[in-house]
Every structure is written in structure tokens, then in C-alpha cells.
Design a protein with these regions (language model features):
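Short glycine-centered segments of the SAM/dcSAM-binding site in methyltransferase folds
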Residues: 39, 133-134
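Short catalytic micro-motifs in class I SAM-dependent methyltransferases
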Residues: 110-111
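Core SAM-dependent methyltransferase catalytic element
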Residues: 181, 186-203
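Class I SAM-dependent methyltransferase SAM/SAH-binding core
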Residues: 41, 47-95
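A short glycine-rich, Lys/Arg-flanked "PGG" loop and its adjoining helix->strand segment in the class I
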Residues: 119-131
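A conserved beta-strand element that flanks and buttresses the S-adenosyl-L-methionine
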Residues: 107
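C-terminal alpha-helical "lid/dimerization" subdomain adjacent to the S-adenosyl-L-methionine
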Residues: 138-180, 185-188
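Conserved class I S-adenosyl-L-methionine
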Residues: 1-35, 143, 153-156, 191-193
């Protein structure tokens, strides 16, 4: 078990079933790009607060995460709410069971700033999407604003208390994804952090 997995396992004990204000905004904005016949991959699904809410909008969801604690909480909430079209799995996005051109939509909420090898991950996301597939992400872009939160996160990360977080600017993040054979179709600020909701289409 690596440090990130241990951290999120600890955090999972404080998870709540209902999405917070920002997560609710993510759900609202995502629904525009979801349809009843779509097969979705939720990359870094966490506690399932978003996953379980959007399940009724799509055909099926494959939800993956590194944290067994988060997945356990998500699965329990799905069962309690009789949600049957989500498969929760503790695997990485590079798991060989995930086949190329399988998914209509891939979600990555509060995930990308933790990734060390972005180009490789973006390439993988692109390969898993069907032609013209949609990649929806929401990411804290800490370079956009000097704040106490930004410096505190950096300090805690250096101490190893929280996982390492990359500090992106909005345009920088969009360019990284675009370079993986995507085009931007929507980009909006959804929190004061600031966090950006970005929708990309596979070229």
C-alpha cells in the first residue's frame, strides 16, 4: 500500500454520502454530456458521492480508485440506494481489463492534480474512449490564485502529510490535455479555490 492509498483510506472514514456544493455543481454540469445509453468510466471515483448520483443518467459506470476505504464506502452507499449499474473496482487506469475504445465518457474529478505522469495518463484516457468520446474533469488549478490554501497544501505535501499535488494554471492544464489528442468544448470556473470544470472531446 503506497502513501496516497493510505491517505485516502484514512480520509474515507470521514466521507459523507451527499455531495458538497462544488460536487453538486459538477453533477449539474456533467449531466449535459450524459445520456441513458452511455458507458462511463469514473477514474478516481473516491467516495462515490458523484458516481452514485449520476448513475441514473447513464447505462453503466465502471468506477475505479486506489483506495479500498473509499470504494467500500461508495459500494455501501450504492447498495443502500439500490443502485445496480455501477461496478466499483480497486485498479489503476492502466489495468489490462480496461480495453481500448470501450467508454463513451470518462470522468476524472479531483484527480488530475495528483497525477505525476500526465501525458501518459491523458494518452491512456484517449485510448479508452470511443471515437468522439468525451473526457470530463474537474481540477484545482492552484497557480491561478495566490492563497493560504495553496501554500498550506504545498507545505503539507512536502512533509508527506498529504499526497503530492501538482499546481496547474487553467491554460496549462487545458494544453496538457489537448496535446493528448483532445479538443476543448467547455471550460468554466466552479469554485473560488479555483477549481475548473473542463470538457474535452476526443479528436
Amino acid at each position: 500500500m503506497n502513501k496516497s492509498e493510505k491517505f485516502f483510506d484514512r480520509v474515507s472514514t470521514k466521507s459523507k454520502p451527499e455531495p458538497n456544493k462544488t460536487a453538486s455543481k459538477i453533477i449539474e454540469s456533467s449531466i449535459e454530456f450524459l445520456e441513458k445509453d452511455k458507458y462511463v468510466l469514473d477514474f478516481g471515483c473516491g467516495s462515490g458521492a458523484i458516481t452514485n448520483k449520476i448513475a441514473k443518467e447513464v447505462k453503466a459506470i465502471e468506477a475505479i480508485d486506489i483506495s479500498s476505504g473509499m470504494l467500500g464506502f461508495a459500494q455501501k452507499q450504492a447498495e443502500e440506494n439500490a443502485i445496480t449499474n455501477i461496478k466499483y473496482r480497486q485498479v489503476s487506469i492502466f489495468d489490462e481489463d480496461l480495453k481500448n475504445e470501450t467508454f463513451d465518457v470518462i470522468l476524472a474529478f479531483n484527480v488530475l492534480h495528483y497525477i505525476e505522469d500526465m501525458p501518459n495518463h491523458v494518452e491512456r484516457i484517449n485510448s479508452l474512449l470511443k471515437p468522439n468520446g468525451i473526457f470530463i474533469s474537474s481540477t484545482a488549478c492552484m497557480k491561478e490564485k495566490r492563497s493560504l490554501v495553496r501554500y498550506l497544501v504545498s507545505f503539507l505535501s512536502k512533509l508527506g502529510i498529504v499526497p503530492k499535488m501538482n499546481s496547474y494554471g487553467k491554460v496549462e492544464l487545458e494544453t496538457l490535455i489537448e496535446n493528448g489528442n483532445f479538443e476543448v468544448i467547455k471550460s468554466e470556473k466552479i469554485s473560488k479555490l479555483p477549481e475548473y470544470f473542463i470538457v474535452m472531446k476526443k479528436k
